[in-house]
A protein has these predicted regions:
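Basic, low-complexity segments
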Residues: 1-50
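Short alpha-helix boundary/capping elements
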Residues: 37, 69-72, 86, 90
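A ubiquitous short alpha-helical element
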Residues: 47-51, 506-509
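Short helix-capping and inter-helix turn/linker motifs at the boundaries of alpha-helical repeat units
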Residues: 54-57
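Non-catalytic DNA-binding core/recognition domains of DNA-processing enzymes
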Residues: 60, 81-84
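Alpha-helical support elements that line or immediately flank enzyme active sites
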Residues: 60-72
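Anion-binding and metal-coordination hotspots
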Residues: 74-82, 96-99, 107-579
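Short, positively charged loop/turn segments that connect secondary-structure elements
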Residues: 87-105
Length: 579
């Protein structure tokens, strides 16, 4: 068991306490600090030994971390505020002579929280206390949303990524110090601290850039050849990670062989049926290596933070970093879930995990989940519907003003004894389908209209030639219209039927009106308490920052609710003390 420090002064009222506004977070934290955080919750962080110096109480460190995120300050500034800020001393119960603790204590404590998986202890404790105090109902409606977090690492171009990956792999292989002389002069250059980070060449010259790329790609492959391959299982995790990182950079950002044909903009060229497109001269021979045209899926952006990704809010705005998802209970305005995910991951992917798995620890199961269209996909509706949770969200419309979309076809799943049928806007009905695979490799039905009927249809120009490649093929006969159903087509049809008429759309807007509360909560997290900018490298540490910031926001809200009346204050204190 940890040994508590005995040199800390007793928590007695200080003469400057009257100067602090009673409605401030500092004053409220001073009232509830003894029941808000307990040392017993963090016993697994310490060894059961009498050796070593007496430990700083973990409750004191956690409360200091809450104040740190409240004031959005660094570890060094938090150390200074522990010494000089009377508001912090009053909130933590420290005397004027107490100098607090060193900034490194905060760093070591965060690392131990992640190692033992205790970063959510206080967050779940506050949510459980709010539920036991009657501030949150188990089945209360909740609203979910997400926002972006800028990564702490810088984004690097391909040249810098390759140089950084080579340097990292050489270091983990042990080619430093005395062993650096065993490397060829070309590879030893990457470890020479006297050499510039960026080579001195004319970056405006395409030939010079191409030559430099060929050199560093050859160096990268030479360094990868230094990794033992006889027994891959015997490689240390650090070496395997660095080698995989460098190999991925080469695969994602560099291509070789004949260059691909240039992409045409707009619709493909139309050629008469039975003819071939005219021959085009082949591009000039350039076998590379050269920079890849386009962006590889899940491309790396940084060597120091390999999990950093580009996220897209729209077609015009993107950011390098991560995405934070939150869930908020509408009545109490308390957060029930905080989670950090990759920036390039769709919002619907973690929706079921956020609502079901995370909230199982706090005993909540909302009857309704309000969200925007990103969370309202058919897959999410089906998965949460099986758990008795209704998703209230708009379905994103299929916009194609020049052609008929899938919404304008009448789909009857129960027709023909379950075989189903699809009717087009011209009144033609088909039940002919074949089985296909969707993007998740699930079996779906693909209904096909007869080629001859579509060729003679008056609406052919509005039906064929749309964005899905329904164009005349230069050799094959022009196909008829095809309509692919969703894997959860019944759920999708039910959701669209509930928001079709103006009255239904108006009713849906009224149900979604409380969703604006989560925007204020996101603004509080991101702008007031600094979550917009990531402090640490990696998704796990960024998630730690998000969870601690969410814990602070919940503590502020819970103590504000407790200050409303004596009954709520007593219920909150009893719930915290019993938890």
């Amino acid at each position: 068991m940890m040994r508590r420090r005995v040199d800390l002064p007793p928590a007695e009222p200080q003469p400057w306490a009257a100067l602090i506004p009673p409605e401030s977070f500092y004053a409220r934290l001073a009232v509830y600090r003894e029941v808000l955080v307990t040392d017993e919750d963090y016993v697994p962080l310490y060894k059961d030994s009498g050796r070593g110096r007496p430990s700083i109480p973990p409750s004191l460190v956690v409360l200091a971390m809450l104040l740190q995120y409240h004031d959005d300050c660094s570890d060094v500034e938090a150390e200074q505020r522990l010494r000089f800020d009377l508001r912090w001393k009053h909130a933590l119960g420290l005397g004027l002579e107490d100098v607090g603790f060193d900034a490194t204590v905060l760093c070591h404590f965060r690392r131990k929280l992640l190692d033992r998986g205790l970063e959510r202890v206080l967050f779940e404790r506050l949510v459980n206390a709010a539920r036991e105090a009657g501030l949150i109902a188990r089945t209360a409606a909740q609203v979910v949303d997400s926002s972006h977090v800028l990564g702490a690492a810088g984004v690097r171009d391909t040249y810098a990524l390759l140089r950084g990956g080579i340097r990292k792999l050489l270091r983990v292989l042990g080619y430093t110090g005395d062993r650096q002389g065993a490397l060829p002069e070309r590879l030893a250059w990457y470890l020479d601290p006297t050499q510039p980070e960026k080579p001195d060449l004319d970056w405006t010259d395409p030939a010079a850039r191409a030559q430099h790329l060929r050199e560093i790609v050859a160096d990268a492959r030479a360094v990868l050849a230094l990794v033992p391959t006889e027994d891959p299982a015997s490689l240390s995790p650090v070496v395997a990670e660095a080698a995989g990182l460098l190999a991925k950079i080469v695969a994602d950002d560099v291509e070789e062989g004949p260059p691909p044909a240039p992409k045409r903009r707009g619709r493909p060229r139309q050629h008469p049926v039975g003819t071939l497109p005219p021959d085009e001269p082949p591009p000039a021979a350039d076998l590379g290596p050269r920079l890849r045209q386009g962006v590889a899926p899940d491309r790396l952006l940084s060597v120091v933070d390999p999990e950093l990704r580009w996220g897209h809010k729209s077609s015009h705005y993107r950011w390098p970093g991560y995405k934070v998802h939150i869930a908020e209970e509408l009545t109490s305005e308390l957060l029930t879930t905080v989670a950090t995910r990759p920036a390039n991951e769709h919002d619907a992917v973690p929706a079921v995990e956020l609502v079901c798995e995370h909230q199982a620890h706090v005993g909540l199961r909302p009857a309704e989940l309000l969200s925007d269209g990103a969370y309202g996909t058919a897959d999410v509706r089906a998965a949460l519907g099986e758990r008795g949770i209704e998703v209230v969200a708009r379905l994103r419309p299929l916009t194609d003003p020049k052609h008929f979309s899938k919404e304008e076809f009448t789909i009857d799943l129960a027709a023909q004894d379950g075989r189903g049928s699809v009717s087009c806007p011209a009144g033609i009905t088909t039940n002919d389908y074949r089985m296909a695979r969707d993007t998740q490799n699930r079996p779906v039905r693909l209904y096909r209209f007869p080629r001859q009927v579509c060729a003679a249809c008056a609406l052919r120009q509005r039906c064929l030639g749309g964005p899905c490649g329904r164009v005349a093929h230069p050799v094959r006969q022009p196909p008829g219209r095809q309509v692919q159903l969703h894997f959860h087509e019944a759920v999708l049809q039910q959701a669209r039927a509930a928001q079709r008429t103006p009255e239904q759309k108006r009713a849906l807007r009224e149900r979604l009106r409380p969703r604006a509360k989560v925007e204020r909560k996101l603004a509080e997290l991101m702008r007031r308490h600094g979550l917009r900018q990531g402090r640490y490298l990696g998704r796990l540490k960024t998630d730690l920052q998000a969870v601690l910031t969410g814990t602070l926001v919940n503590a502020k809200r819970l103590l504000a609710l407790a200050a409303r009346d004596a009954y709520t204050a007593r219920a909150v204190r009893q719930a915290l003390a019993s938890g």
